[in-house]
Structure formats: structure tokens, C-alpha cells
């Protein structure tokens, strides 16, 4: 009897332990799940899922103003102002796309010249294209420098203090379209001026405009220098020598009687003419006598 009671008591204790263990396990699981959720939320706050590379967003002037006004916090925004017809803008645009992949934590916007009013460009201090503007609540920095990828990365790092999440290699330019608007490179490749004018007429016209401006600036300076040089040269000449030379020339003319020489020449010519006439008459008479003698001999 006592043994049966003891066995039942042991079974009851085992069942109670099993039920208590099974009841406490969901509590422990819920506690672990709550801690994991806190860790996940903290991780997403520090590394948001929007870090995946996104291409720059094309916006117009009104959309840019709205995005600038709605910007809050320390979030950075990089804006590219460009013109589709400009070869330098076409060279910077792929680099700007690379920057959006290397710095996904920065929002990248692109504003084309024809999609915004001139007041928008003047409001943000844009006076040349292409231009890159880095903006947040306390920063409004416009990039001044070379447009190569390494210089742009250094500008991003200095302006924001952020490091690129990845490095993208810049592709080699191929063909005339990828020549980055470099006229020297095109000429080295043997590209004719006519082909360059067909591909980028604005580049050729801008070079002609620069040459005309240089000519307009240089010509007055060169003209004044030439006048000063001519004045100094004429002032140093001894005009008295020219007077002496002219006097000697006049004296020589007076010493030589030109009229007498002309008369002598005319007399010589007339004498030669008369002598030739006499010779011609003698020659004609001799021919006539010879012809008469021949006719008389024939008649006999």
C-alpha cells in the first residue's frame, strides 16, 4: 500500500513538472522574440532598407522646390543640373549615376535645363552647366573642380563625411559619342572637323566664338603697339639725309641735258632710216636691171 502511494506521488510530481515546463516555454519564447524584434528595429533604423542603389530621379523645377522644402533631418540630397545638348553634361551624367550607386544613403536628383525656369537655376546659384549641388538642412555646397569620378568622390566624402558602400570602375570611352566632348582626343583619333561639327555643333561654335573674342581683344592692343613702333621708328629717321639725296638727284638731272640726248637719238634714228632707204633703192634698181637683161636675152 505504501509503495503504491509513493509511486502515485512520484507520478504526480512528474506530471506537475511537465505541465509547468510546458507552460513556461511560451513565455520564454515570447521574451526572446521581443528582444529579436527590438534588435531588428534598431538595425533597420541604423541601416535602412533604402540603401539599395537607386538611379537618380529626373525632376522639374517645381518638384525640386517641393523636395527641398520637405527635406527634414540630416538627410543629404545631391542635385545635378545639366543640359542634354551639352557634351560636358553628357560626360558627367554617367558619373553621377555611379555616385548614386556608391552613395545610396544620399538622394540623387537630376534637373534638365529645359525642365526648369531660369529663376530656379538662379535661386540655387547655378550659372554654368553641368553643376552638382549638395544640400541638407545645414549645408548648401556647390561643387567647383574637375568632373572626374575620383574628384567627385572626394567632394562627397568631404561634404557629407560618408564613405562609399562600393566602388564602381569607370568605363573606358569608346567611339565619338563617348569621347567626353574632348576635342583634342577627337583630333588625335583623326576625326575631321566636319564630323565634329555634325556631332557637336555647339562645341565648334563655342570655339569660334572664343577665337573671335580673342581677336577682338588682341587687335586693339596690337594696333596701338604697331602705331607706337612706327612713330618711334619714323622719329629716329634722319629726314635731312633724304633732303640731301633729293638735291643731289636734281643736280644730276640738271647736269645731264635730257633734251640734247633726245635730239641726238632722234638724229641717229633719222640717219639710219635714210641710209636704209638708199640701200633699198639701190637694191631695187639692181634687181630691175637684172630682170631687163634676162628679158632681152629671151627675145633674141
From Swiss-Prot:
Transmembrane segments: 202-222
Subcellular location: Membrane
Residues of the signal peptide: 1-23
Superkingdom of the organism of origin: Eukaryota
SUPFAM superfamilies reported in the protein's UniProt record: Thioredoxin-like
Glycosylation sites: 136
Primary localization: membrane
Gene3D superfamilies named among the record's database cross-references: Glutaredoxin
Alphabetical UniProt keywords: Glycoprotein, Membrane, Signal, Transmembrane, Transmembrane helix
Annotated Gene Ontology cellular component terms: membrane
Pfam family, one: Thioredoxin
Domain Thioredoxin: 41-161
Protein's membrane topology: Single-pass membrane protein
Matching InterPro entries: APRL5/7, Thioredoxin-like_sf, Thioredoxin_domain
Record-given protein name: 5'-adenylylsulfate reductase-like 5
Organism: Arabidopsis thaliana
Gene giving rise to this polypeptide: APRL5
Amino acid at each position: 500500500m505504501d509503495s503504491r502511494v509513493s509511486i502515485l506521488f512520484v507520478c504526480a510530481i512528474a506530471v506537475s513538472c511537465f505541465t509547468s515546463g510546458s507552460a513556461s516555454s511560451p513565455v520564454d519564447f515570447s521574451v526572446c522574440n521581443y528582444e529579436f524584434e527590438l534588435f531588428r528595429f534598431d538595425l533597420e533604423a541604423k541601416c535602412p532598407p533604402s540603401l539599395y542603389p537607386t538611379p537618380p530621379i529626373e525632376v522639374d523645377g517645381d518638384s525640386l522646390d517641393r523636395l527641398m522644402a520637405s527635406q527634414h533631418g540630416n538627410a543629404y540630397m545631391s542635385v545635378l543640373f545639366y543640359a542634354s545638348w551639352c557634351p560636358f553634361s553628357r560626360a558627367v551624367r554617367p558619373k553621377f549615376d555611379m555616385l548614386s550607386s556608391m552613395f545610396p544613403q544620399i538622394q540623387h536628383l537630376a534637373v534638365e535645363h529645359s525642365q526648369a525656369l531660369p529663376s530656379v537655376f538662379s535661386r540655387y546659384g547655378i550659372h554654368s552647366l553641368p553643376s552638382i549641388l549638395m544640400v541638407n538642412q545645414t549645408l548648401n555646397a556647390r561643387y567647383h573642380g574637375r568632373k572626374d569620378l575620383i574628384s567627385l568622390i572626394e567632394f562627397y566624402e568631404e561634404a557629407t563625411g560618408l564613405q562609399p558602400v562600393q566602388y564602381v570602375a569607370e568605363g573606358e570611352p569608346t567611339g565619338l559619342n563617348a569621347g567626353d566632348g574632348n576635342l583634342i582626343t577627337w583630333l588625335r583619333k583623326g576625326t575631321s572637323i566636319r564630323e565634329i561639327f555634325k556631332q557637336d555643333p555647339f562645341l565648334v561654335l563655342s570655339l569660334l566664338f572664343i577665337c573671335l573674342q580673342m581677336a577682338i581683344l588682341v587687335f586693339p592692343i596690337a594696333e596701338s603697339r604697331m602705331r607706337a613702333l612706327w612713330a618711334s621708328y619714323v622719329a629716329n629717321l634722319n629726314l635731312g639725309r633724304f633732303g640731301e639725296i633729293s638735291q643731289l638727284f636734281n643736280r644730276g638731272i640738271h647736269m645731264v641735258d635730257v633734251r640734247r640726248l633726245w635730239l641726238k637719238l632722234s638724229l641717229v634714228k633719222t640717219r639710219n632710216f635714210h641710209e636704209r632707204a638708199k640701200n633699198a633703192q639701190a637694191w631695187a634698181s639692181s634687181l630691175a636691171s637684172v630682170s631687163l637683161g634676162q628679158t632681152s636675152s629671151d627675145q633674141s
